[in-house]
Amino acid sequence: MEISWGRAMWRNFLGQSPDWYKLALLVFLIVNPFIFLANPFVAGWLLVAEFIFTLAMALKCYPLLPGGLLAIEAVIIGMTSAAHVREEVAANLEVLLLLMFMVAGIYFMKQLLLFIFTRLLLSIRSKMVLSLAFCVAAAFLSAFLDALTVVAVVISVAVGFYGIYHRVASSRGEENDMLDDSHIDPHYKTVLEQFRGFLRSLMMHAGVGTALGGVMTMVGEPQNLIIAKAAGWHFGDFFLRMSPVTVPVLVCGLLTCMLVEKMRWFGYGETLPEKVRDVLQQFDDQSRKKRTRQDKIKLIVQAVIGVWLVTALALHLAEVGLIGLSVIILATALTGVTDEHAIGKAFTESLPFTALLTVFFSIVAVIIDQHLFAPIIQFVLQASEHAQLTLFYLFNGLLSSISDNVFVGTIYINEAKAAMENGAISLKQFELLAVAINTGTNLPSVATPNGQAAFLFLLTSALAPLIRLSYGRMVWMALPYTIVLTLIGLLCVEFALAPATEWMTQAGWLATLS
């Protein structure tokens, strides 16, 4: 018997999302206009809370859908205007170009990145050194590339290796289902569990590595570019200004990586079983024998393009998104990718998040029009200049650990810049606050998958169920990093940032502040 029209519509609404989630969103959409009529300020804060809720529930439904519905309603009922949304989008065009073109550009360099991580995995036998290598490699790559792409590459390596061993363990060849362990011999299951633990720890080290590297440069994370633009910094300026906080944090993060592996704390320390290593080595040897001269040329070309990418970013030869577009053109032209559909695949990872970021800007427009953060900013600005840095860092960190850090960073840098333009703070203090906002947004956000887009991408990937990486396990494994990164970042903001910035200014490394 066919279902009713009403039931069919309910099932279509937000698809496979739970009924309670659908009902919650409907309640939000119904009550918002009435609360806005009664008290616009309260309605604005309620909208922000609802939007953060959709980000926190990203595993139930991709936030673009519910967040987009809330944003559309906000424009319709007058919480902001379509014109203001357009202004916010136009002001942040560089960030949208970064997401569209840079992520797609790196897609065409995946062969090189896969080659690098495969060599690391099979060449280094010490688990501690291997973990450190993955963390450092992810940090370095994320300083110049998009963290999402770096994690996507490491996921590709892990899924590939897991599939190779799973096929051998199940003896089912190409018909093997990686999610089905029923055909695996009992003596293989123990080895498989150990292999899963090994991959889990490597993925977490790589994920944290993207955060450690991503906070250091203006292209490491999308919000970095927003903050850099607000402060008028180029690539070198941004790196130097962040370094009093980010360099000590990087060192302590790498020491944490070594410590948890050595002590086998928080689910770390599992080594690669020799049986698995033998299988993977055989597969890699066969792959290398099959590699043609044409394939080798592709790797060389991608390496040269990588050098161009780093050089262009460091010298600020063009806007970041346009450099990404040049990578797409060079990589496709010189490696023979000419089919439109093959090129189109490069954009599938970035465009949903680009659309979500546009929705972010709609909510930011509401925050500006309704003056939602005015009380918080006034509270912070009443404190001494020294205390302001700590408060901005902590407020950013708290929100970023439960919500998306791009959203949080955008809000706070806009408010800080408005305070400077209104004469509430000096240019010198604003630039210090920009560092506190950037580090506060990036470092504590490793606490949960909600804060870091790369972590959320890992959690929702095809790899997570294979290696038994759940939300709770991810939070638990991230805990030592969360504690160390947050506390070291706070101490550096509190004690090192202002004197180090002053010293660099006097040494002529930074432009003299007016």
Swiss-Prot record:
Entry membrane topology: Multi-pass membrane protein
GO cellular component: plasma membrane
Compartment(s) of residence: Cell inner membrane
Highest taxon of source: Bacteria
Keywords attached to this entry: Antiport, Cell inner membrane, Cell membrane, Ion transport, Membrane, Sodium, Sodium transport, Transmembrane, Transmembrane helix, Transport
Transmembrane segment boundaries: 23-43, 63-83, 97-117, 120-140, 144-164, 202-222, 238-258, 303-323, 357-377, 391-411, 447-467, 475-495
Cell membrane recorded as keyword: yes
Annotated Pfam families: NhaB
Protein's UniProt keywords contain Transmembrane helix: yes
Annotated function: Na(+)/H(+) antiporter that extrudes sodium in exchange for external protons.
NCBIfam families in the cross-refs: NhaB (TIGR00774), PRK09547.1 (NF007093)
Full protein name: Na(+)/H(+) antiporter NhaB
Species the sequence originates in: Salmonella paratyphi A (strain AKU_12601)
